Amino acid sequence: MSKVSPSPFAEEQAALVFVGNQFLFRWRQGDAVQSKFISPASVRAAFSAEPIDTGWLPPNIRRWGTGASGDWAVLSIPPMRHSLLFEHITRDIPTMMLDIPLPALVFMRIGSASYIWALKDDFAPDAPLYHAPLPNVNISGAICFGGNRLEGRTLSQAWQLFLDSPFTSHQTNGKSRRQPDDVRLLLASLHKRRRYPLRDLAPLQPRITVDQAVAALTRAQPNRYITVD
């Protein structure tokens, strides 16, 4: 705590001053002006009457936070089989339900946006990311939910919505070494198979890790791959 020169604002009783990335709380005490640095958590608590409660978190939540874009969380999904609905893989079959193995996945939700990536190995902050071998996911890993709305849905509900939604012919390229033009052709060949061929995963270019992707999205640190809207 320190004494500083009186404020130029004669009527000021207290003030919160932004000093770089820190917060300086300043108040009058008699004829002097006192000040001290306070943490962002203290500022948040002072301006919010509502307690922060994540609610019950699903298993494999790796990280949670909040920022300018809203609440965010990172979920890891181990390798497993999924039953997914695909549209128009072939001209004569409008829809097809496939029981397929998928690699380990990272699902991230931030504000109203959701992202998904694949992993070759176990989850780790420094693990390199690969394109999720699924349609309806753009080059940054952002998921297109079509007309489905995410507002009011929990992280688990958003993940389940992604699995339950039909996968279309949109954004099917660049996600498989064996089938670079349409990853659905690879997925159809994996129906009832036990394991996903990890060698077929397409790495993100340039290479980026889980931690770098999360930092780019949550701290507004764009890089050559992940762009912050």
Give the residues covered by each predicted segment.
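Domain-scale recognition of soluble eukaryotic interaction modules
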Residues: 2-9, 125-229
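Compact alpha/beta protein-protein interaction domains typified by the UBC
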Residues: 4-10, 14-150
